[in-house]
C-alpha cells in the first residue's frame, strides 16, 4: 500500500496498490449485481438521452459480493488507519456508475454534510473498478473537510 498525502491536514489522500485483483473482482461483481437489481433508493443522475449516471445506496446486506468486499478487503483497515481509530463502522455503501460517454459531470460537493455524523473520524472511500482518464477522475480540494459545509444537492443538472 502506498499512501500519498496527509489525511488529517488535507482531508483526502491517494492510496495506491491497496486493492488486490481479487478484491477488485468482488467489487466489480457487486456493482454488476447492484445494477441488475437496483434498490428503491437508486437514482438516475443523468438525463434520459445521456449515458447513464446511476447511484444506489445501502445494498451490502443483500448483495453477497458487496458484503464480502466490505468485510474482507483492506478498505476498513485503511479507514481505521487514516482516521486513527481502533474500530470502523459502515455508515452506508454508495455505488456511483457512469457509463462511458456520459456527459453529466459530478458536481462539486462535500460528503460530510450528507451524513448524520459528528466528529473527525469519518472517511469516504472512492475507487474506480475500470480505468479512468485523469480528466474524468475524482478531484479533491484540500482542507474543505474543516468547513464551512455546503448544503447537499443532487448530481443532476
Spans of features found by a protein language model:
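Non-heme Fe(II)-dependent double-stranded beta-helix
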Residues: 1-10, 15-108, 113-116
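Short, conserved beta-strand element in jelly-roll/cupin
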Residues: 116-133
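A structural signal for well-ordered alpha-helical scaffolds and beta->alpha junctions
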Residues: 72-76, 122, 156
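Short, structured patches in soluble enzyme cores that scaffold and shape functional sites
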Residues: 94, 110, 127-131, 140-142
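Short loop segments at secondary-structure junctions
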Residues: 17-19, 100, 129-133, 144-145
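Active-site-proximal flexible loops/turns
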Residues: 18, 116-118, 137, 149-150
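Double-stranded beta-helix
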Residues: 133-157
Amino acid at each position: 500500500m502506498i499512501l500519498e498525502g496527509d489525511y488529517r491536514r488535507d482531508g483526502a489522500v491517494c492510496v495506491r496498490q491497496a486493492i488486490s485483483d481479487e478484491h477488485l473482482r468482488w467489487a466489480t461483481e457487486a456493482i454488476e449485481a447492484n445494477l441488475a437489481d437496483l434498490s428503491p433508493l437508486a437514482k438516475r443522475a443523468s438525463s434520459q438521452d445521456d449515458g447513464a449516471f446511476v447511484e444506489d445506496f445501502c445494498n451490502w446486506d443483500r448483495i453477497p459480493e458487496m458484503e464480502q468486499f466490505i468485510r474482507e478487503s483492506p478498505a476498513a483497515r485503511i479507514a481505521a488507519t487514516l482516521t486513527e481509530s481502533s474500530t470502523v463502522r459502515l455508515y452506508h455503501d454508495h455505488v456511483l456508475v457512469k457509463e462511458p460517454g456520459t456527459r453529466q459531470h459530478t458536481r462539486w460537493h462535500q460528503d460530510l454534510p450528507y451524513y448524520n455524523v459528528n466528529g473527525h473520524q469519518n472517511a469516504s472511500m472512492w475507487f474506480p473498478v475500470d480505468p479512468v482518464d485523469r480528466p474524468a477522475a475524482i478531484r479533491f480540494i484540500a482542507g474543505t473537510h474543516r468547513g464551512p459545509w455546503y448544503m447537499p444537492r443532487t448530481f443532476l443538472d
